[in-house]
Amino acid sequence: MAKGQSLQDPFLNALRRERVPVSIYLVNGIKLQGQVESFDQFVILLKNTVSQMVYKHAISTVVPARPFNVSAHQGTAHGEESDAE
């Protein structure tokens, strides 16, 4: 795992696993809302009434709608489930 990914992956994975609603602000100011369905190195799949593939380089900020625990889910990454935690 690259050093820059060490916080990003557990953060996004916890949002995905707990189905936390998020607001994603793009660098051009547009606000997207939904739940993180999946993600990889370059994109986040955001689900609301439709699924949108959002490129990470276009994202400014990810704002969770409610508190959640990142540290409880640090065993997995990239939107994949893990039974061994």
Swiss-Prot record:
It holds the Pfam family Hfq. GO terms for biological process: regulation of DNA-templated transcription; regulation of RNA stability; regulation of translation, ncRNA-mediated. Homohexamer. InterPro entries: Hfq (IPR005001), LSM_dom_sf (IPR010920), Sm (IPR047575). Gene3D superfamilies: 2.30.30.100. Disulfide bonds: none annotated. Residues 9-68 form the Sm domain. The keyword Cytoplasm does not apply. Belongs to the Hfq family. One of its GO terms (molecular function) is RNA binding. RNA chaperone that binds small regulatory RNA (sRNAs) and mRNAs to facilitate mRNA translational regulation in response to envelope stress, environmental stress and changes in metabolite concentrations. Also binds with high specificity to tRNAs. Keywords: RNA-binding, Stress response. This is RNA-binding protein Hfq. GO terms for cellular component: cytosol. The keyword RNA-binding applies.
